[in-house]
Amino acid sequence: MHDARQVLQKLWGYTDFRPQQRPIVEAVASGRDVLAVLPTGGGKSVAFQVPALLRSGTTLVVTPLVALMEDQVARLRSLRVAAACLHGEQSAAVRSESLAGIETGRWALLYLSPETLLSPPVWARLQGCPIARMVLDEAHCLTGWGSSFRPDYHRLGAARRALGHPPLCAFTATATPADRARIERWLGLVDPVRLVIAPYRPNLAIRVRWMYTTHQRRDAIGAFLASRPDTSGLVYLRTRAGTEKLACELAKAGYRTTHYHAGLGAAARRRAEGDWLAGRLQFLVATNAFGMGVDAPHVRWVIHAHTPPGLEEYLQEIGRAGRDGEAATALLLASEPTGWLDPTDRLLHRHFAANRLEQWQTAEKALARLPAQGDFRPELALSLALLHERDRLVWETPFRYRLVAAPPIRPPEAGPLVQDFVRTRRCRWQFLMAAFGEGASPPCGRCDRCTGRTFK
């Protein structure tokens, strides 16, 4: 740890690591596999960046978003660390420089997405590169996105083996015990060092309100915003069209806002994010495409205009408020329990469930005609990921699979946890802590169940 502290002080200016960082740094530096569940702002990046500078070889950092990797690389280069990233939005000259640096072993840290890692030009160059370790940042994307629209996540365990089985560190801010087990199994972690910090945020007051009409939902958002005229926040919706419509309505009402979703071009997304971070926009109206890795301490509130699909996503998103330790609020607007007066949440759930069922039906059809062994086929990427999720397929290499005998696959049923959370009479934080494996915890004293107040 002495060498690690020297690097920390020389480059980052800190005399010692935070208590939660020390076991991670020790494990990474000693070549152990690691699974770390740390709240955002817990210093996870430094925990793997410092060890990457203590030994030769390249540390591959697999991260989901271009903005994340570019931000990290810019910070490292300002410290004169040999770091680079690879993604499809780069100019030809920048990409060429990054690729050349792989072959010469120039990079101490190389940031890239799963898709870029497994692309032919990058994969070919990595074969001759000494890989010191791999890092999977935002590891919850493996369980949350890997079998929906980022199927290459499911090939990362095989990629690791093909690269000589370097130590692997997986970091995330939220993961249930079941998801932690899946991450370990799918990545092939061997006797990992596990560090799990409870996601409890004592300064974050959680509120849930029943909505009985679509008009009431709009009014509730307007009233909440009017009560916080000079504060920064985020409004989350489930659909792209919904974000555009609501942002337009609120902008016409005089609010400094715009929409954000994955369907926007890269320039538009970065402009919206930059304007919000700089304070030119009071808030963004966004889908779940926004927020991962964004460290904005000034966020005072988060609104969910609809019930989110899962508690992992919900906890990730409300955790973007109050990172400075000051009081913050998370407001969830849920359709009334019957779904008859306000069917919004029920209709959204049916829409996404139908899409999911269609994906499973496609996977079942693919299974019936796949050979027992075969090569990766891009047109079947999602079906292959679903089969891997259900233990019907193993990746022998990142580009070759083998089917395994197992009972017929069935779509996993969505757990009732989100609706249980909305309807619970317990302290909201007590419910969340239990759902994430934290056991008994005292009431928070701040949520709507503890205070009897919904809106303040």
Regions found by a protein language model. Give the residues of each.
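C-terminal helicase lobe
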Residues: S232-Y236, R240-E244, C248, K252-A262, ...
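Conserved pre-motif I regulatory segment
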Residues: M1-V37
